[in-house]
Amino acid sequence: MKVPLSAFSTYSTVNRMTGEQQLIIWHNGEKRVVKSPRTHKYYMHDKKGREYKVLGKSTTQLLREYNVENLGELRPESISPLSKIDGLTRNEVERVCIEHPNFFTEFESREPTSLGFDLEVTSADGSFPSGPQHPIVAVGIVTDDGQRKTILWDGKDDKELIIKFAEFVKNYDPDIIYGYNLIGYDIPQLFARAGHHNINLRPYLNRDNHETYGWESDFSYHKKSKVETWGRLIVDVYNFASRDYALAGLSKRLKDVSRFYGLKPIELDFNLNDILDYDLDTINEYVLSDCDATKYLFNHYFTQHKYIAEVLKVPLETYMNSADSFITKILQGRALFKRNILTFDKNNERHPEIESFQAAHIDLYSPGFHRYNYKVDFASMYPSIALALNLGPDTTRILRYEDYDIGKFGCESADSGLYMILTIPDNVLDKNVIIRVDLKDKSCLYKMCKQFKEMREPYKRMGGHEAKSKSNGLKIMVNTFYGANTNPYMSYGDIAVGLAITGIARWLILGAKNIVQKRYGDDAVVYIHTDGVNTNCDIDVEWINDELRNAMTSLFPLSESEWISVDKDEFKEGFWIAIGNYVLRNLDNSLTKHGSTFKSRSRSQFYVKVLNKLIDARLDNTVNQDFIKDIYNFENYEVDDFLQSRTMNQNIGDYKNENDLVVQLATKAKAEGQKVKIGSSFYYYKTNGGVELEGNVDSIDDIDIKYHWNIISNLLQKFDLTQWINKKPPITALDRKQQSLLEFV
C-alpha cells in the first residue's frame, strides 16, 4: 500500500523538549512518531503587511504573518480573536495532506491485514436482542490469511466467549477490523456485554494495549458512520453497500446484498424462533456464512477505496473516516495553497445571501408506457462543464446580482481573452447572478478533472475487478467536486462554481431536448433528469454532439466545447409513473427501477408480488381480464406475505401523535412484555381489527382484505390501468366462509 494505515496528531502530540509538533503514524503494523513538516502560522490584518490573495475577495488583502511553534499555540485562547487561520482548521493531519502532498507517501505500508467478525445474540426477553441483558451466543471470525473460526458460548454465560474473541484479535493483530453493520450493532453489543461482565476490551482491541482510547459507540442503526481505535481501522461494510448505486431501490440487508452479488447465504427463520432454537452446528454454519458473505463484500468494495487513498496520497484511515467532501477539500485545498490563495471563511460566510439556488432541470413530458426507450446521456456532465469553461474556486467568483431575466442568460468575453462574464438567471434567488471566470491560467478543477479522466481511460478498457474498481474510484473523485463547491460549510471551494455549473447544465439539457424535438418531433422526449434526456425513438448522438458543441462555441466563444459530449443508452420497454418514478427493461431483460413506488425495503411481500406481476404484464402488454382476476385473487397469497415492518427512530414520547403507527406497535409490544427502544423493529399485520404484531395472526381470514385490495387498485391506477380497477372486493373475498357456502350451494 502506497500510504500508511493512519496518522494522528492533536494539541497534545508535542515534543515537550523541543516544542515540535509530532505525528503518530501507523504503518506495517507499527507506530512511528515523526516531526510534522508544517510551519504553523496565523494572519492578522495590517496596513503595513504584505499583499495576499484571499478566496472570494476581488482585491488582495494586507496581512501580517505570524509563525508559532506548534498546533497548541494556535488554540483560540492563545491567539487574538481577530486572527485568521488558513483553511479555518486546526486539523493537523488534514493540513499536512494539503501543504505537503507527498509527505505520507514516505510511509508506504504492507497490504493491510484484516479480520471480519459477526455476532449472534439471543434475546433474553423476546425483544430485539440489543443491550447488556442479551447474551452473545456465537462470534464468527474470518481473516485475510484464510482462517474461519467460530467461538461458541458454553450454554450458560458469554464471558469466556468475549475474552477468547478479544484475545484472538489481540494475537492476530489486524490492521483492519470489519463487519456488516458492526458500528450500529456488533460493536455496541460486544461492549454492552463486556460491560455487563466488567471487562475492559480496549487493551485487547487497541494496539499498544491502550486502555482508554476510542471505541465510542451506541446502537445508532446507521446514524453513526465511524468508530475510532488506536492503531487500527474499523470498516463497516454496510456503509459501502448503502452508497452502491447498483443496489438502488433494494434492501441493504446482508443477505439481500449478498444474493445480488451471486452469493448463497444461509437463511434461518427468526420470525418465531430465537437463535438458541437451533443446534450449535447450525449456528456455527450460519454465523460463518454471514462472515463469508461480509468478507466477499469487503474485498469487493475495499479495492476502490484503498486506490482513492493512494491517489490522494493520504493515510487510509483519514480518507475512510472522512466526509463526502474530503476528496475535494484536499485537492482544491492543495491547489489554493500552491497558488498562495488563503481561505479565511466558509461558503455561507462569503455568500450569506445564498441560502439555496435553482436546481438541475427535471421534468416528465410523456408519462405512461413506451415500447422503445433511448437515453441521451451526458458524459460526466458537471466535470465536463467545469473543463469547458475553466471553472474552479481559483478562477470563478460572483461579481454582483441583477434583476431576474432568463433572456439574458449567456456570456460576455473580454477582447483580451483573459476572462469572461457569465450571466446565470436563477429563479430561486430571483436574480441574475453575474460571475467572472478568469482564463489566464487553467483552474485547479480543470487540471484535476483532465488528469483523472486521462487516468481513467485505460482502466475503462481493461477487464477485471481491480480495473473496474480503480475506474469507479477515479469517477467518484471527478464527480465529488460539484457537491463540495456548493456545500455551505466548505472553505476550500466557492458556490460560484456550483451556480455556474448548474445554470449551464440546465441550458445544455434543455438544448438537447430542443435538438431532439427539432429532428424527431415534439413527442419524442419522454423525461429529463439532470444530465439525461429519455426519448421514445432512436437518436443520432453524433449529430446531437455536433449541435451542442456548435451552440456552446456560439454562446461561449472562449470555451473548450470539445469537452461536452453525450452517449446513447438503449432500453426495451418502459413505464413512467411520475417524476422520479419509472421502470425500464434493460437489453438483458433485467429491470432498472427508480422511485418510491419501486422501493421494497419496508413493503410487505404482498406488495412486492403484486408490483412485480404488474411490471411484467404492463411491459409485456398482457393485461387482460384473466390477469386482473388473478392479481385480485387472494388465494394466491399466504399469511406471511402480508407481514410489514416499521422501526422506532425516536423515543415514544417524542412522537407527536399517539395514534402514530409506531406508537401503536410499541404499545402493543410493551404490553406483551417486550422492551422497546430506539431502533426496535416491529413486524405486524394490518387486520380487520387494526394492527397486530407478528405471532398473533395465524390465518388469512384475519387480514384486512379491503386495505390490501386498495393497494392493488392504487398500483393499477399508477400504471394507467384505471379501467381495470375493481373498486370493491366481493363478499366472498372479505369472508371466506361465504366462498365455502357459495361452493356448497
Set out the residue ranges of the language-model regions:
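Conserved DEDDh/DEDDy metal-dependent 3′-5′ exonuclease domain
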Residues: 2-4, 149-249
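Acidic, Mg2+-coordinating catalytic module of metal-dependent nucleases/exonucleases
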Residues: 172-186, 190, 230-326
